[in-house]
């Protein structure tokens, strides 16, 4: 049977959103002992939590996420933005293709000329250590680079063609999804399972086509079951009638075809198993467990060993890239005279696993760890269980100390007086 693909389950999109949720569904904490205020300002000014989620999606379906830093007149903090990896072209060392020396961001822009004809231009930003170079070229109709054009064609005022940044590294930070040793580009989460995605959608479309066909099946039977429509002249069968059948006449009936749908459903199960293997997911990751019980936190982590392992790999890349992004932003601001910029930024990122918290299980663990031989301070327990800023944690510790002080006050005892008694 030949079926047209009219049904798509978008399993790739579900994979990307799953790992983005595990990475940034719970926002990580950025901790700096000496520059916490600057770090918080930088995060708030750039909406970094939302930007990180977009970057995680891009990392999954493009193979890498790309951050770019720049300064904007009138803004105190540097601007960090996520740009499409489709416009990123690395400049690599000829002797080591994985070592990136610079970055070219290039995209096509269009503009109508005086004759109403659309002219294409190639816009490029070339990021090298210590400098940024802005360029614009006119393209021919078949996309060949022609003469160089003035940046004022699109911008007023135009950006400087050559600009010193004061930073010894390019202001572009790349987060690969999975690195390989023969390419500067990362591998996405889809390429290993492309054929399985196609087969899943195709089988579901075939089943849907069969079911649609059998909602209005063809009939067969004797001529006596037909009557002529006076409006159209066609011979039709009226539903809901009784047809008497002569001794030698075939009874009316429906044409039924055994589509072997059970085989299709079994094949879909095998496809899903292959998808789970290729994408490091499973039914539990998509809340498709057949049992009605809800696993606890520890049990859920055991069920999600493979998804969490891939998430940890992604987290390794993001941890390095984000700490580098913060460091470059501080250097850029300091080199261009921004205020309240830290010197050598020491940043630590506290990541979460993205799984729903089990408060009782977490509290029991913390109780064990903080009682007897304490392996965790009360401050750390409050931060992990309740979150909050350092100020709110200090306030909570002060309340705890006050409660303990009240509980340790000396007890007041009343002296018993004997009334009506006289001394001997």
Task: Identify the residue ranges that each predicted region occupies.
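Extended, helix-rich architectural segments
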Residues: 1-100, 411-412, 417, 423-424
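Active-site-proximal structural scaffolding
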Residues: 60, 189, 193, 264, ...
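Extended, charged amphipathic alpha-helical segments
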Residues: 152-302, 345, 356
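Glycine- and charge-rich intrinsically disordered segments
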Residues: 201-208, 215, 219, 406-424
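Active/binding-pocket-proximal capping segment
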Residues: 275, 289-296, 321, 328-348, ...
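Extended amphipathic alpha-helical segments with heptad-repeat/coiled-coil character used for oligomerization
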Residues: 305, 309, 313, 320, ...
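Long, highly charged low-complexity segments enriched in Glu/Asp and Lys/Arg with interspersed Ser/Thr
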Residues: 380, 385-417
């Amino acid at each position: 049977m030949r079926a047209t693909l009219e049904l798509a389950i978008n399993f790739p999109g579900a994979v990307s959103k799953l790992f983005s949720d595990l990475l940034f569904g719970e926002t990580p904490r950025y901790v700096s002992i000496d520059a916490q205020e600057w770090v918080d300002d930088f995060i708030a000014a750039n909406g970094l939590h939302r930007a990180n989620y977009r970057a995680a999606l891009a990392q999954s379906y493009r193979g890498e996420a790309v951050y770019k830093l720049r300064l904007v007149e009138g803004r105190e903090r540097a601007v960090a933005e996520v740009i499409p990896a489709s416009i990123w072209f690395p400049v690599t060392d000829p002797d080591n293709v994985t070592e990136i020396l610079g970055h070219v961001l290039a995209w096509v822009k269009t503009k109508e000329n005086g004759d109403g004809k659309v002219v294409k231009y190639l816009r490029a930003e070339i990021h090298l250590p210590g400098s940024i170079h802005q360029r614009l070229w006119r393209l021919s109709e078949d996309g060949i680079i022609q003469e160089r054009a003035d940046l004022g064609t699109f911008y007023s005022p135009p950006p400087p063609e050559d600009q010193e940044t004061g930073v010894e590294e390019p202001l572009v930070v790349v987060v690969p999804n999975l690195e390989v040793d023969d390419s500067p580009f990362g591998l996405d989460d889809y390429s290993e399972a492309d054929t399985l995605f196609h087969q899943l959608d195709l089988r579901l479309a075939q089943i849907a086509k069969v079911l649609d066909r059998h909602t209005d099946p063809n009939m067969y039977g004797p001529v006596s079951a037909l009557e002529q429509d006076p409006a159209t002249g066609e011979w039709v069968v009226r539903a809901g009638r009784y047809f008497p059948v002569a001794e030698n006449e075939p009874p009316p009936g429906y044409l039924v075809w055994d589509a072997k749908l059970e085989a299709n459903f079994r094949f879909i199960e095998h496809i899903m198993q292959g998808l789970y293997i290729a994408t490091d997911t499973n039914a539990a990751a998509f809340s498709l467990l057949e049992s009605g019980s809800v696993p606890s936190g520890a049990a859920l982590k055991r069920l999600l060993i493979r998804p969490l392992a891939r998430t940890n790999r992604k987290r390794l890349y993001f941890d390095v890239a984000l700490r580098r992004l913060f460091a470059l932003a501080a250097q850029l601001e300091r080199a261009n005279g921004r205020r309240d910029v830290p010197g050598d930024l020491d940043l630590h990122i506290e990541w979460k696993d993205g799984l729903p918290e089990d408060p009782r299980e977490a509290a029991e663990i913390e109780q064990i760890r903080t009682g007897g031989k304490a392996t965790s301070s009360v401050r750390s327990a409050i931060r992990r269980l309740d979150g909050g800023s350092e100020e709110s944690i200090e306030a909570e510790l002060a309340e705890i100390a006050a409660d303990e002080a009240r509980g340790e006050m000396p007890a007041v005892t009343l002296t018993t007086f004997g009334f009506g008694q006289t001394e001997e």
